[in-house]
């Protein structure tokens, strides 16, 4: 269907002019900056993944947005959060709010483990995920046995009762 988007737009709308697409993070930046009351602003966008960008830093000034930096797939806070969503037994792309909701009931006792093993936070605010712990590149799951070993606990089955451990992991991620 995506291959025929331009054709379908022209056919369904009776439109003959050019059809232009913007990049995913560019759209996020524009929808945040242009309706804002600011003439100049720093713009930070972060989500799972757009085309290849997962995070972007831009400068909005008057009627222009200048891209300053991008992080690219697979290094993504959105995908990191989805990996934890999966590991904690919730459905990816719909259960992330449950992880956020669990966080206040836990203690961030695993934060150091997460930083030491799963994500490398850089001085400039960027980050790199340690892909040895994740399976979303080619596997059928978000995480793998090495991820489970970090927490000394298997991936939670969605039918099992939540424990303090899951709450502490959610708090540590948050």
Region spans (language model):
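Short acidic/glycine-rich loops and adjacent helix/strand connectors
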Residues: 1-174
């Amino acid at each position: 269907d995506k291959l025929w988007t331009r054709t379908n737009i022209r056919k369904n709308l009776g439109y003959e002019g050019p059809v232009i697409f913007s990049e995913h993070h560019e759209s996020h930046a524009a929808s945040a900056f242009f309706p804002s009351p600011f003439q100049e602003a720093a713009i930070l966008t972060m989500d799972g993944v757009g085309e290849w960008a997962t995070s972007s830093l831009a400068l909005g000034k008057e009627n222009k947005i200048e891209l300053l930096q991008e992080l690219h797939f697979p290094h993504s806070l959105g995908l990191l959060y989805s990996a934890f969503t999966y590991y904690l037994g919730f459905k990816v792309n719909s259960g992330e709010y449950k992880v956020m909701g669990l966080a206040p009931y836990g203690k961030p006792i695993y934060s150091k483990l997460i930083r030491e093993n799963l994500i490398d936070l850089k001085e400039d605010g960027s980050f790199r995920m340690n892909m040895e712990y994740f399976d979303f590149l080619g596997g059928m799951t978000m995480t793998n046995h090495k991820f489970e070993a970090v927490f000394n606990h298997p991936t939670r089955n969605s039918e099992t009762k939540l424990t303090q451990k899951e709450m502490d992991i959610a708090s540590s991620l948050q």
